[in-house]
């Protein structure tokens, strides 16, 4: 369908020399919009129009002010100051109804470019207004076009009438219907309508066709319009009715009349002050509104600087203004989304710099009428002159092309370029609120109008002076003035120096720079020359001079080598050094609960635990505590370790666990209940934490804190892993430098440092030495009061633990106790005269027999046999010695009174007592017998020893050794090496190695190593004398011994004469586990592991901690728990940190329920009351069990604790745990026998003896010629009721334990010293008839 164009009469004759300018009545033929620019961006109304459902009604008042334009197509020469023509936006959208109730009315007339029907309705309040509108429409449309229109007039409420003109399509093929337009006639018509401005509002209805939006055209008035024939035109009628109301004074449109009237009252008929106030409430500044009436009365040509909207944008000749009119659009209110209209989108303006805002000018208006300012195209130009009548109209098709090129052609004066107005209505994103920029708000919000929206603090401002450029605040007006003057060109981010050319983008930098011109900075440190611009810098700097400030330590340089502080070995990593340091420690915190082995390193311990995990089926492993099953051993091990917890206190509300009860109480109070369980006893203070209560009592109740602290002792901090303090490292250094171990090839006695031979007189240690001839071991005890108790404990230790047996090489341990009083006196006094009785400390000599073995056979002492030594106490007087020995036996004969024999041997032993009658002046004798004669060792006054004759040596006599170890209390001195000698050949067996001296604090004289011991290794077999570098291989070797020259596999009948063959065969049985658990799939190589495993099924935990109540299934675990969690320093009690010779700690254990008796005996043995009175001793012996044991230091760090399983003669199996911390043997289990805590000792049957490796029982060895037994048997021989060594009640209580009988016998023998001496031999004879060699300690009173 072709479009109809309405052309004016001036289109054909354009003015000479004038370019064709677009008119606001031009039609957009072939384009989507008629006019592409208007003044809507400067005339944005605060209120938003409401569109109807058709989507056409919308508000176009989106600018900052409304602008009215003067038509350039008018042919009149006179300006029309009171005439307001519609702008392009109204023309492009259709007919507009004029509002006559306000200021001068704007008459809107239009014609459609396309042959569609247009329906225009006008409602007037009077017939005059309606007739005027009819005349204007008739003159605008033209006489030729009005013939094809239908006029429909209808009455409305209030007497208003609506006249509708139906423009019909022509009968031809869409030929354009044109009529000449006279602008002068239109002007006269508008002037006539102005006289009716007081009438009611008239509206118009625009009927738009489907082909596109209609564009109004101003046409000259015409007279004599006639109504067309309706019947002939009905077939060509197509009507689309859209009712719309438009304001004549601005571009506001509305679909309802009420909204338009409200808009006109608020925007056009309110006083200026009220309008400004309303605009201020909406948060926007209307720059175009006039403020005074004097400005309204000025002429339109008069220019005033106060009316300039943006002086920077207008006067900026370099065109570098950053002003953008689009930024002013959303100031007052948020833009609403416009609904899409059926019109095609208007052409978009090309992106580019926005044009400058034109200057506003006030035109002369009649009194009482508010006028809108006219807009000029340039700020310096005068209002536009009326155009020539012959000026070209904008309705021509040639001008339509120019209108499409808005950005290239000059735009009509008074038309602003608005992106928001030219945007397509169907694009809602164009009207969204602009995102707020971060940082300081825009300068447009810094005006007075927006101050009421600022946050005002109720407190007075510390810096009341505000810079409006950058928003900074200052204390004084002078600082503000200096700051404002420093802003370069008003830029908030650029500062300049007022005295030089310095520029900076930071105010602080400029402030610091300005002090270069002043000469000094205002703030200075009081203690040094430091100055600064800011006081806070000086305050921060002053902390350097504060004494209370903790100085940061200098960063330690990264080390590439980590030397060991003890031995000097260097490691490349700290982790390796930490692991190495554990080798110097005696602590083995990790103990296996299945086999009893302990380890220093957790990694080694975990690797060992993997050996106890057995597969269930198909290489799947099951947890022993729950139903967890996995395929990885290590994963299962980590899972099982999670079941073992050292935190017995568990929260009842959550899974929290801890090892201290006060921690649990604090946790429950803080996390769950909110209570304060720890209350002060002296006031009302209470707290949730125990440490706060202690702090409160110490600060607030200082006088009562000491008493309160005794009732509430502070628990020591727990240490969960080995820790090496500086003190411990220094002790380890001294041990390493003082007692270095000998090389493996020569295990002879090391050099004894001076501190090894010194001992304190107040705490007299037991000194042990060995005689190479007779294997004699001498114990020296100084101090008259302590001699009895210390001698008793040392003798029992040697008898029961046999800690020195391995070093002496003996298999039969016999103890002889000799007591003398005047030995020290003879050595100390000149001429050998005895000293006074009170100045001589007691000397106790312990004689150990030399066993028959390889070492004894090499010496020239006679045949290798086991000498018979029988204990025979003699009736000692006040002074004298008792030397007990036996004559040498013939080769091949056995001793009738062997310690392991059950035959009575009372008559075979001979006792020789050297009394005062045998002493000579200045000489003391120790006599021994070879069966026919006595030999003696003479001790001279200077301490030298007179050796016996060579005949005595050739006779093979066993010569005991006497060493003076007692010194006066006030002057302790180390004994001279000249006072300690070994009688016999220098190639005899070696003396006590460092293990014994370390464990018991021995003074060992240095001697050169012999050839026989030089080739020996650390561990050797006593049957075949084969040496081994490790204990494990030696134990395997001993188990395979089937005789002196044969070996047999312990798991099968295989046998061989060479150990390597059996060792290679035994490797095939290494994976065999014959002992199967009856409740699960566990299997072990031996019975002891199986018995330990069974405890996991019974869940038996017999050992309980008395401090926290946690229970354990191993006593060693309990001790480790107490040491780790409850020990103050994290060490094992009784285990000294240093290995230097110190006093051997003692322990007294009484098993009874009477606390008084326990305290009595404990005090007697450990508080320097060595000699017990008859009353106290009788009170102690009346209890059930008295077991005296000695805890020793660890002799070898690498030895781990182990479990030994022993089968008794009656078929019972006893398991013993030998720990490495104190070398004490514990009973693990014994069938049918109640456990006796904490120690149990055994007596071996005939033909066997116990080998001791560094204080640990390693194996049971057969004597030469004795029958070999497949399984070792150890027999417990109880004391018979007929023996009267102790009371009947004590014998019944000690029936299960031989060691209890030994201990009781020793104590009873000590008690017998206060009785008759005639009963003592009878008791010894009774013991000998029983076949048990009980070693009796003879104690003599002063």
Swiss-Prot record:
Task: List, in alphabetical order, the Gene Ontology terms for molecular function in this entry.
Answer: histone methyltransferase binding; RNA polymerase II cis-regulatory region sequence-specific DNA binding; transcription cis-regulatory region binding; zinc ion binding
Task: List S-S links within the chain.
Answer: none
Q: Entry's InterPro entries? A: Zinc_finger/UBP_domain, Znf_C2H2_sf, Znf_C2H2_type
Q: What does this protein do?
A: Component or associated component of some histone methyltransferase complexes may regulate transcription through recruitment of those complexes on gene promoters. Enhances ligand-dependent transcriptional activation by nuclear hormone receptors. Plays an important role in neural progenitor cell proliferation and self-renewal through the regulation of specific genes involved brain development, including REST. Also controls the expression of genes involved in somatic development and regulates, for instance, lymphoblast proliferation.
Database matches in PANTHER family: ZINC FINGER PROTEIN, ZINC FINGER PROTEIN 335
Disease the record associates with this protein = Microcephaly 10, primary, autosomal recessive: A form of microcephaly, a disease defined as a head circumference more than 3 standard deviations below the age-related mean. Brain weight is markedly reduced and the cerebral cortex is disproportionately small. MCPH10 is characterized by extremely small head size and death usually by 1 year of age. Neuropathologic examination shows severe loss of neurons as well as neuronal loss of polarity and abnormal dendritic maturation.
What is this protein's name?
Zinc finger protein 335
Organism, as annotated: Homo sapiens (Human)
Originating gene: ZNF335
């Amino acid at each position: 369908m072709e479009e109809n164009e309405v052309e004016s009469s001036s289109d054909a004759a354009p003015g000479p020399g004038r370019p064709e300018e677009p008119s606001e009545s031009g039609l957009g033929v072939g384009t989507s919009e008629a006019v592409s620019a208007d003044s809507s961006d400067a005339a944005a109304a605060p209120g938003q129009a409401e569109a109807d459902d058709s989507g056409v009604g919308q508000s176009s008042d989106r600018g900052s002010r409304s602008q009215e334009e003067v038509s350039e197509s008018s042919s009149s020469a006179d300006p029309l100051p009171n005439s307001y023509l519609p702008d392009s936006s109204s023309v492009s959208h259709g007919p507009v109804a004029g509002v006559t109730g306000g200021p001068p009315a704007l008459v809107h007339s239009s014609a459609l470019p396309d042959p569609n029907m247009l329906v225009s309705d006008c409602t007037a309040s009077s017939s005059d207004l309606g007739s005027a509108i009819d005349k204007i429409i008739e003159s605008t449309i033209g006489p030729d076009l009005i013939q094809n229109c239908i006029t429909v007039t209808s009455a409305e409420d209030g007497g208003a009438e609506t006249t509708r003109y139906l423009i019909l399509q022509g009968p031809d093929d869409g030929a354009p219907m044109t009529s000449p337009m006279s602008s002068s006639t239109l002007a006269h018509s508008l002037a006539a309508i102005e006289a009716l401005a007081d009438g009611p509002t008239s509206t118009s209805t625009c009927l738009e066709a489907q082909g596109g939006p209609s564009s109004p055209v101003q046409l000259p008035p015409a007279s004599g319009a006639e109504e067309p024939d309706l019947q002939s035109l009905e077939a060509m009628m197509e009507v689309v009715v859209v009712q719309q109301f438009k304001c004549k004074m601005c571009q506001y449109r509305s679909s309802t009349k009420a909204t338009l009237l409200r808009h006109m009252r608020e925007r056009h008929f309110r006083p200026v002050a009220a309008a400004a106030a309303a605009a201020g409430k909406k948060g926007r500044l209307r720059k175009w509104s006039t403020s005074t009436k004097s400005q309204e009365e000025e002429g339109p040509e008069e220019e005033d600087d106060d009316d300039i909207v943006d002086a920077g944008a207008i006067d900026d000749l370099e065109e570098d203004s950053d002003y953008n009119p689009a930024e002013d659009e959303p100031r007052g209110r948020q833009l609403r989304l416009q609904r899409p209209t059926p019109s095609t989108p208007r052409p978009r303006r090309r992106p580019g710099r926005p044009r400058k805002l034109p200057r506003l000018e006030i035109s002369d208006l009649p009194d009482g009428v508010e006028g809108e300012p006219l807009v000029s195209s340039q700020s310096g130009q005068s209002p536009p002159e009326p155009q020539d009548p012959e000026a070209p109209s904008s309705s021509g098709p040639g001008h339509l092309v120019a209108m499409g090129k808005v950005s290239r052609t000059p735009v009509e004066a008074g038309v602003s370029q608005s992106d928001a107005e030219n945007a397509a209505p169907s694009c809602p994103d164009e009207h969204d609120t602009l995102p707020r920029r971060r940082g300081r708000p825009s300068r447009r919000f810094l005006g007075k109008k927006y101050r009421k929206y600022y946050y005002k603090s109720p407190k007075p401002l510390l810096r009341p002076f505000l810079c409006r450029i950058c928003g900074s605040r200052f204390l004084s007006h002078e600082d503000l003035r200096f700051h404002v003057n420093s802003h370069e060109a008003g830029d908030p981010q650029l500062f300049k120096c007022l005295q030089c050319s310095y520029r900076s983008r930071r105010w602080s930098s400029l402030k610091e720079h300005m002090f270069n011109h002043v000469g000094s900075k205002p703030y200075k440190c009081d203690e040094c020359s430091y100055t600064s611009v800011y006081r806070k810098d000086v305050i921060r700097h002053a902390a350097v001079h504060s004494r209370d400030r903790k100085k940061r330590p200098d960063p330690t340089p990264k080390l590439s080598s980590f030397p060991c502080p003890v031995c000097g070995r260097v490691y490349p990593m700290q982790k390796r050094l930490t692991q190495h340091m554990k080798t110097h420690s005696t602590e083995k915190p990790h103990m296996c609960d299945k086999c009893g082995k302990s380890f220093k390193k957790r990694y080694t311990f975990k690797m060992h635990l993997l050996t106890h995990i057995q597969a269930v089926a198909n290489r799947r492993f099951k947890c022993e505590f729950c139903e967890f099953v996995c395929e990885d051993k290590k994963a299962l091990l980590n899972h099982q370790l999670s079941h073992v917890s050292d935190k017995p206190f568990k929260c009842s509300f959550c899974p929290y666990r801890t090892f201290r009860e006060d921690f649990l109480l604090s946790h429950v109070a803080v996390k769950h209940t909110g209570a304060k369980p720890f209350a002060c006893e002296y006031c009302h203070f209470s707290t949730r934490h125990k440490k706060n209560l202690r702090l409160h009592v110490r600060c607030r109740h200082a006088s009562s804190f000491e008493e309160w602290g005794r009732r509430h002792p502070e628990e020591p901090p727990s240490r969960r892993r080995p820790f090496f303090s500086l003190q411990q490292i220094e002790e380890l250094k001294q041990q390493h430098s003082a007692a270095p171990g000998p090389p493996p090839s020569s295990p002879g006695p090391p050099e004894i440092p001076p501190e090894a031979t010194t001992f304190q007189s107040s705490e007299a240690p037991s000194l042990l030495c060995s005689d190479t001839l007779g294997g004699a071991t001498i114990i020296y005890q100084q101090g008259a009061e302590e001699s009895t108790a210390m001698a008793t404990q040392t003798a029992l230790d040697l008898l029961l633990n046999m800690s020195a047996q391995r070093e002496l090489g003996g298999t039969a341990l016999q103890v002889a106790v000799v007591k003398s009083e005047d030995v020290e006196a003879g050595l100390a006094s000149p001429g050998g005269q005895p000293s006074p009785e009170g100045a001589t400390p007691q000397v106790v000599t312990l004689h150990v027999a030399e066993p028959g073995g390889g070492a004894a056979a090499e010496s020239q002492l006679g045949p290798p046999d086991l000498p018979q030594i029988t204990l025979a106490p003699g009736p000692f007087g006040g002074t004298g010695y008792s030397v007990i020995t036996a004559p040498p036996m013939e080769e091949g004969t056995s001793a009738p009174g062997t310690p392991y024999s059950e035959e009575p041997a009372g008559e075979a032993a001979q006792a020789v007592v050297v009394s005062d009658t045998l002493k000579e002046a200045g000489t003391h004798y120790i006599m021994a017998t070879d069966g026919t004669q006595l030999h003696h060792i003479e001790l001279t006054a200077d301490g030298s020893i007179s050796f016996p004759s060579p005949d005595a040596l050739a006779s093979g006599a066993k010569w005991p050794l006497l060493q003076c170890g007692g010194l006066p209390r006030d002057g302790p001195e180390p004994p001279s090496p000249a006072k300690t000698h070994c009688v016999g050949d220098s190639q005899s067996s070696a003396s006590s190695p460092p293990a014994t001296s370390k464990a018991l604090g021995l003074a060992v004289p240095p001697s050169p190593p012999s050839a026989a011991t030089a080739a020996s290794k650390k561990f050797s077999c006593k049957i075949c004398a084969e040496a081994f570098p490790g204990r494990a291989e030696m134990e395997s070797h001993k188990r395979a011994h089937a005789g002196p020259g044969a070996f047999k596999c312990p798991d099968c009948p295989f046998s061989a004469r060479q150990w390597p063959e059996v060792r290679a065969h035994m490797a095939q049985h290494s994976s065999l586990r014959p002992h199967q658990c009856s409740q699960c799939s566990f299997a072990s190589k031996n019975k002891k592991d199986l018995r330990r495993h069974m405890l996991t099924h019974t869940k038996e935990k017999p050992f309980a901690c008395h401090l926290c109540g946690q229970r354990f299934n191993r006593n060693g675990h309990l001790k480790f728990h107490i040491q780790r969690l409850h020990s103050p320093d994290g060490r094992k009690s009784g285990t000294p940190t240093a290995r230097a010779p110190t006093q051997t700690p003692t322990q007294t254990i009484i098993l009874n329920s009477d606390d008084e008796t326990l305290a009595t005996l404990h005090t007697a043995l450990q508080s320097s009351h060595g000699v017990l009175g008859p009353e106290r001793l009788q009170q102690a012996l009346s209890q059930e069990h008295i077991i005296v044991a000695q805890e020793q230091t660890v002799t070898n760090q690498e030895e781990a604790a182990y479990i030994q399983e022993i089968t008794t003669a009656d078929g019972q199996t006893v398991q013993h745990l030998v720990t490495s911390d104190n070398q004490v043997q514990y009973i693990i289990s014994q069938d049918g026998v109640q456990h006796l805590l904490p120690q149990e000792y055994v007596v071996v049957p005939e033909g066997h003896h116990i080998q001791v490796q560094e204080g640990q029982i390693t194996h049971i060895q057969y004597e030469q010629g004795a029958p070999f037994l497949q399984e070792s048997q150890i027999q417990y021989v109880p004391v018979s009721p007929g023996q009267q060594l102790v009371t009947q009640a004590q014998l019944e209580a000690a029936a299960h334990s031989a060691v209890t009988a030994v201990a009781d016998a020793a104590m009873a023998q000590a008690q017998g010293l206060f009785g008759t001496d005639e009963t003592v031999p009878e008791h010894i004879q009774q013991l000998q008839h029983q076949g048990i060699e009980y070693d009796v300690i003879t104690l003599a009173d002063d």
